[in-house]
Amino acid sequence: MIYYSNYYGGYGYGGLGCGYGCGYRGYGCGYGGYGGYGNGYYCPSCYGRYWSYGFY
């Protein structure tokens, strides 16, 4: 299961966007899972222009 938000800070699953530098609502690529606060259900990674979400 992988979800994408758009480049310019789109609110996809997790509410993050790479347009805001891997940490618009979260705290960098190491944090900011579902809802943007790293609750452990999703692990975000930044691939180029898109956030990619996948389960741990």
From Swiss-Prot:
InterPro entries assigned to the protein according to its UniProt record, in alphabetical order: KRTAP_matrix (IPR052878), KRTAP_type8/19/20/21/22 (IPR021743)
GO CC entries: cytosol; intermediate filament
Keyword tags: Keratin, Repeat
Pfam family name, one: KRTAP
Effect of S52L: In a breast cancer sample; somatic mutation
Origin superkingdom: Eukaryota
Family indicated by similarity: Belongs to the KRTAP type 20 family.
Oligomer and partners: Interacts with hair keratins.
Its job: In the hair cortex, hair keratin intermediate filaments are embedded in an interfilamentous matrix, consisting of hair keratin-associated proteins (KRTAP), which are essential for the formation of a rigid and resistant hair shaft through their extensive disulfide bond cross-linking with abundant cysteine residues of hair keratins. The matrix proteins include the high-sulfur and high-glycine-tyrosine keratins.
Protein name: Keratin-associated protein 20-1
Organism: Homo sapiens
Gene name of this polypeptide: KRTAP20-1
